Regions:
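Glycine-rich, flexible loop/turn motifs
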Residues: 23-31, 38-40, 48-51, 80, ...
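Amphipathic alpha-helical transducer elements in NTP-driven molecular machines
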Residues: 32, 46-49, 62-68, 82-96, ...
Length: 365
């Protein structure tokens, strides 16, 4: 699963990405300093792993991960190929969700491509470019579907009607995710690879002087929240500059730095955790002397498909899953005691996995 980190030039996008991945993307004070997308694999914070590893005396801990892609900045007209528009659009098609960094700080030393700080205007610019790109794509498909209706095949009429709904939505400058589809329609829409079907998380990038303030005291943040609420999207408040500084520190120093700022966890941990949920992901856990590990699955995944994440043979020859809830296992003290207490369940092929399930799969191939 990939998240694309987007934003207008000089809003703090690359600075935030540096903090997320330690990848050192060049954060220079001029547009388009991020020419090719930088990719970083980030660990999903999960305190359960350390406790589980201690229980099993595991030699290795492997957390779940999520992939972030730093995508080159864009300006008005990106959908027509201006700026680095075409590159931006091709890269953003490949991600599953969007983290949209929005500037909510004033700094005379950092220019703004639109000559002034206005987060709602910035959001509107990018959203419009995505809508226009989708509109172009849908228009071509709609014209083709309409031309095939005369063949008498009903499927082209159904396709045309659905595309017309999508076209009308985009023509009103609304994203496709604002529409509701039945299961069959959703499959078709997924195959269109439209940009405005992707879930969005707004990262409101504040200045250092605003850290610790109540969000109600930050008018620019409030504007972003009001805009996002209308869309049904989330907002996460973060200071990219400080997060980048924290990311360069040893763990102990980073914790002290956070405490000095009056924070209990870094904004990055919140961002990664929120992004994981945004994608509808959960983790199940496996543990043993060799390794304790978190495995990423989509909510609603059944046991055989979850087993397939470990190895395809596990899914092909699935027999059952021995499952115990993480908290229950911790309370029992170890797996043997949990089993003796009747807390370990044997689940079959229809079992829907839950976040925090500690699992031992049985299979035969």
């Amino acid at each position: 699963m990939k998240l694309g980190v987007v934003g207008l030039p000089n809003v703090g996008k690359s600075t935030l990405f540096n903090a997320i991945t330690h990848a050192g993307a060049q954060a220079a004070n001029f547009p388009f300093c991020t020419i090719e997308p930088n990719v970083g694999i980030v660990a999903v914070p999960d305190e359960r792993l350390d406790k589980l590893a201690a229980l099993y005396s595991s030699k290795k801990i492997t957390p779940a991960t999520i992939e972030f892609v730093d995508i080159a900045g864009l300006v008005k007209g990106a959908s027509r190929g201006e700026g680095l528009g075409n590159k931006f659009l091709s890269h953003i098609r490949e991600v599953d969700a969007i983290v949209h960094v929005v500037r909510c700080f004033a700094d005379d030393n950092v220019t703004h491509v639109e000559n002034g700080v206005d987060p709602v205007r910035d959001i509107s610019i990018i959203n419009l470019e995505l809508i226009l790109a989708d509109l172009e794509s849908v228009t071509k498909r709609l014209d083709r579907a309409k031309s095939y209706i005369k063949t008498g095949d009903k499927k082209y009429k159904i396709e045309s009607d659905l595309l017309q709904r999508i076209y009308d939505c985009l023509a009103e400058e609304k994203p496709v995710y604002s529409l509701e589809f039945n299961e069959e329609e959703q499959k078709y829409v997924n195959g269109l690879f439209l940009l405005t079907t992707k879930p969005v998380l707004y990262a409101a990038n504040i200045g250092e002087e605003d850290i610790g303030k109540d969000e109600s005291e930050l008018p620019l943040v409030q504007k972003v929240k009001e805009y996002a609420q209308k869309e049904g999207n989330q907002v996460l408040v973060i200071c990219a500059k400080v997060e980048e500084e924290i990311s360069q520190l040893p763990a102990e120093d980073a914790q002290m730095f956070l405490e000095d700022l009056g924070l209990t966890e870094s904004g990055l941990d919140r961002l990664v955790r929120t992004s994981y949920k945004l994608l509808g992901l959960i983790s199940y856990l496996t543990a043993g002397e060799t390794e304790t590990r978190a495995w990423t699955i989509t909510e609603g995944t059944k046991a055989p498909q979850a087993a397939g994440k470990i190895h395809s043979d596990f899914e092909r020859g699935f027999i059952k899953a021995d499952v115990v809830e993480y908290q229950t296992l911790l309370e029992c003290g170890n797996y043997t005691k949990a089993k003796e207490a009747g807390k370990v369940r044997s689940e079959g092929k229809e079992y829907v996995m839950k976040d925090g399930d500690v699992v031992l799969f049985k299979f035969n191939v």
